[in-house]
């Protein structure tokens, strides 16, 4: 592998600009070689002066890069030292509190189940758990910094070696010895000491001396590009997707030849439509995950996932394919129910019952950690006013806004099984056209409108909670106003529908109000998508016209196509209203809704790419590469002390004027000496060397 590719694959994305600009140096060297005057047409002194002038410029650029790397490394190392001292203080405090309350100094002797502990013991248990997670994330940050150190040194060695080869000189090697090999970022070995001390602390204080268990907890995933999925996972993805395609073809043929024309298929479509949208969403989320990894958008950090254990795009494809097969089989079983002893209405219950069981399955199988993370996230979303709202919380609530049809179809299914289904008929899900009452899919009894507002309500109260926590009216209250327009839009749609059915004279009043609020909502959300969520139309965009100063994805066309797509699908409702209000075709509203619901899921899929890109660039601006695990809250005294430390002569000053350093943990100058500190072991992370000159 060429070193440029190796460097690109192994850098920490949030620190990209702080690495050696290897490709820029290569371009400088090759340009100088191509533009050099030929010895055949000019004298030798002119050629020497040309290369001497180039070398002066080249080494000046090297000095700037070296200064940048030294400064950044020193800043991150100082941050790591402060963080380590804080974690040691918190650990010592937890151990002291544990000793006072239980009379036991080690964690080994605390074997009571969590639900048998007192409130104080529960708090201590939670603190220890948080400390384990905090040390794990801290260790990851140390490995990233060590990787930064090794990659930059290798980069300087490679580019200076290439310099000497092209210019046929040894001045590059001399410059490396005189400058790089004595640079603080290379000579400083404190990072290795911190790694060893962290391993020792976790082993002796948190894992009862079990080094194997400690290293399993601290294990860092391979740095670099996404690792290939296990062969069996890849096999299952291909198998499931192939079966799903074949079953879909079978479904189309069965629908053509098996369905009876005197039967209404809409109850069946409404019941199975939500399942299809969920499968589509999972599949597109897999594509999102793949795209983020390829572009270097660190979605693992953004969603605060465990970097050591999380679902890849292959796993999401596998789940989507498996559920897709079950969905097709269930629908096929409904078509062929007349020749079986099982009534039609059993199959949807079996399908969705299995999906629910798959999600809440308490055994540690079938991606237990990921399912548990999703359940916790769903709980936080539906109890939004009582928790601080993180990125993953409002991201999931935004997804629910695009999946509102699933909630409405779930409400329809419950209503249909409760009020409309004829349990004594084997074809209960395919009633006669004359017998379809049509109560459940209308706004008549009010529940449907409430269900339609639930996703917008969740985001609305999340915005209010964020305003309460930050006291910032913009953007949180303004964003809440965006979601509040949905309430008016749904209300007037419901009033228009019910008044139209009853033939009231004021029907058109509600129709016009519905249209007005639909326009307001669409314009509001479109502007917010493009400007706030995606960060586009930045006045400092420079050559990236109508975009932003920095973009992650390689082609500008992606952004322009996404803008056009968002505009079209945000106003697709105009087509729906035009058709339903002018045509006499029965079930025209259901037909349009069935067509546009998957398109809305697709719109959210595109939105996800650019929303996470914008969040990733925010993390890059703050050089945030690991999760901030809060062990103890930061109070006013701690904040003052932190600012004093930042202003000390031996401290590292913030180089970004518009940014203030914030830590979620208490800061203390006291650094207690734990027993584990005398047992530190050296740990090294090997960076693949690519010494062959052909590979540079």
From Swiss-Prot:
InterPro entries: EXS_C, SPX_dom. It comes from Homo sapiens (Human). Homodimer. Inorganic ion transporter that mediates phosphate ion export across plasma membrane. Plays a major role in phosphate homeostasis, preventing intracellular phosphate accumulation and possible calcium phosphate precipitation, ultimately preserving calcium signaling. Binds inositol hexakisphosphate (Ins6P) and similar inositol polyphosphates, such as 5-diphospho-inositol pentakisphosphate (5-InsP7), which are important intracellular signaling molecules involved in regulation of phosphate flux. Residues 673-696 are annotated as: Disordered. Allosterically activated by inositol hexakisphosphate (Ins6P). It comes from the Eukaryota. Residues 2-224 form the SPX domain. This is Solute carrier family 53 member 1. Changing residue 466 to A: Increases phosphate efflux. Signal peptide: none annotated. Changing residue 165 to A: Decreases phosphate efflux. Changing residue 497 to C: Decreases phosphate efflux. Decreases phosphate efflux. The chain crosses the membrane at residues 229-259, 265-296, 310-337, 344-365, 389-422, 430-471, 473-503, 507-534, 554-585, 588-626. Keywords: Cell membrane, Disease variant, Membrane, Phosphoprotein, Transmembrane, Transmembrane helix. Residues 260-264, 338-343, 423-429, 504-506, 586-587 are extracellular. Changing residue 533 to A: Decreases phosphate efflux. Phosphate binds at residues 398, 401, 482-483, 570, 603-604. The modification Phosphoserine is found at residue 668. Changing residue 604 to A: Decreases phosphate efflux. Coiled coil: none annotated. Changing residue 235 to G: Decreases phosphate efflux. GO terms for biological process: cellular response to phosphate starvation; intracellular phosphate ion homeostasis; phosphate ion transmembrane transport; phosphate ion transport; response to virus. Changing residue 136 to N: In IBGC6; phosphate efflux is impaired; present at the plasma membrane. One of its GO terms (molecular function) is virus receptor activity. It catalyses: phosphate(in) = phosphate(out). The keyword Transmembrane applies.
């Amino acid at each position: 592998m060429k070193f440029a590719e190796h460097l690109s694959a192994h850098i920490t994305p949030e620190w990209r600009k702080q690495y050696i600009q290897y490709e820029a140096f290569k371009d400088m060297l090759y340009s100088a070689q191509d533009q050099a005057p030929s010895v055949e047409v000019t004298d030798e002194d002119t050629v020497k002066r040309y290369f001497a002038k180039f070398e002066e410029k080249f080494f000046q650029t090297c000095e700037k890069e070296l200064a940048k790397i030294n400064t950044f490394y020193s800043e991150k190392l100082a941050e790591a030292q402060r963080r380590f001292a804080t974690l040691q203080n918190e650990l010592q405090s937890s151990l002291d509190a544990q000793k006072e309350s239980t009379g036991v100094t080690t964690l080994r002797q605390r074997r009571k189940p969590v639900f048998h502990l007192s409130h104080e013991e529960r708090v201590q248990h939670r603190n220890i758990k948080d400390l384990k997670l905090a040390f794990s994330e801290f260790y990851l940050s140390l490995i990233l910094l060590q990787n930064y150190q090794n990659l930059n040194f290798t980069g300087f060695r490679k580019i200076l070696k290439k310099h000497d080869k092209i210019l046929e000189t040894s001045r590059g090697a001399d410059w490396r010895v005189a400058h790089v090999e004595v640079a603080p970022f290379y000579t400083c070995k404190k990072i290795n000491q911190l790694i060893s001390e962290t391993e020792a602390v976790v082993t002796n204080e948190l894992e009862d001396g079990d080094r194997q268990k400690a290293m399993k907890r601290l294990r860092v995933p391979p740095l670099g590009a996404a690792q290939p999925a296990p062969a069996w996972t890849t096999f299952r993805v291909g198998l499931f997707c192939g079966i799903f395609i074949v079953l879909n073809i079978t479904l189309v043929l069965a629908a053509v030849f098996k369905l009876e024309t005197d039967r209404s298929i809409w109850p069946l479509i409404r019941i199975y439509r939500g399942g299809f949208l969920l499968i589509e969403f999972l599949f597109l989320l897999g594509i999102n995950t793949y795209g983020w990894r390829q572009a270097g958008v660190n979605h693992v950090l953004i969603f605060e996932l465990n970097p050591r254990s999380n679902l890849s795009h292959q796993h999401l494809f596998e789940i989507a394919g498996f559920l897709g097969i079950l969905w097709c089989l269930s629908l096929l079983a409904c078509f062929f129910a007349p020749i079986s002893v099982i009534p039609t209405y059993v199959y949807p219950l079996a399908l969705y019952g299995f999906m629910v069981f798959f999600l809440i399955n308490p055994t540690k199988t079938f991606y237990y950690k990921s399912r548990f993370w999703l359940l916790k996230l769903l709980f936080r979303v539906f109890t939004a006013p009582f928790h601080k709202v993180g990125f993953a919380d409002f991201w999931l609530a935004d997804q629910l806004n695009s999946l509102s049809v699933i909630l409405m179809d779930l409400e329809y299914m419950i209503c249909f099984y409760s009020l409309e289904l004829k349990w004594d008929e084997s074809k209960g899900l395919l009633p006669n056209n004359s017998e379809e009452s049509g109560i459940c899919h209308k706004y008549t009894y009010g529940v449907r409108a409430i269900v339609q507002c639930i996703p917008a309500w969740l985001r609305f109260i999340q915005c209010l909670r964020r305003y309460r926590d930050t006291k910032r009216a913009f953007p949180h209250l303004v964003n809440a106003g965006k979601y509040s327009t949905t309430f008016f839009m749904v209300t007037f749609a419901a009033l228009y529908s019910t008044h139209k059915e009853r033939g009231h004279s004021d029907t058109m009043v509600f129709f016009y109000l519905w249209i007005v609020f639909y326009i307001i909502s669409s314009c509001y959300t479109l502007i917010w998508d493009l400007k706030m969520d995606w960060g586009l139309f930045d006045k400092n965009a420079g050559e990236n016209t109508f975009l932003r100063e920095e973009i992650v994805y390689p082609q500008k066309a992606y952004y322009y196509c996404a803008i056009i797509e968002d505009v079209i699908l945000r106003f697709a409702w105009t087509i729906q209203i035009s058709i339903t209000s002018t045509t006499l075709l029965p079930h025209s509203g259901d037909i349009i809704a069935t067509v546009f619901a998957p398109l809305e899921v697709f719109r959210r899929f595109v939105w996800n790419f650019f929303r996470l890109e914008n969040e990733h660039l925010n993390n890059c601006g703050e050089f945030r590469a690991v999760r901030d695990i809060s062990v103890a809250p930061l109070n006013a005294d701690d904040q003052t002390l932190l600012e004093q430390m930042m202003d000390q002569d031996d401290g590292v000053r913030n180089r970004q004027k518009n940014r203030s350093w914030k830590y979620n943990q208490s800061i203390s100058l006291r650094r207690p000496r734990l027993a584990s500190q005398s047992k530190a072991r050296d740990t090294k992370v090997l960076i693949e060397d690519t010494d062959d000159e052909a590979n540079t």
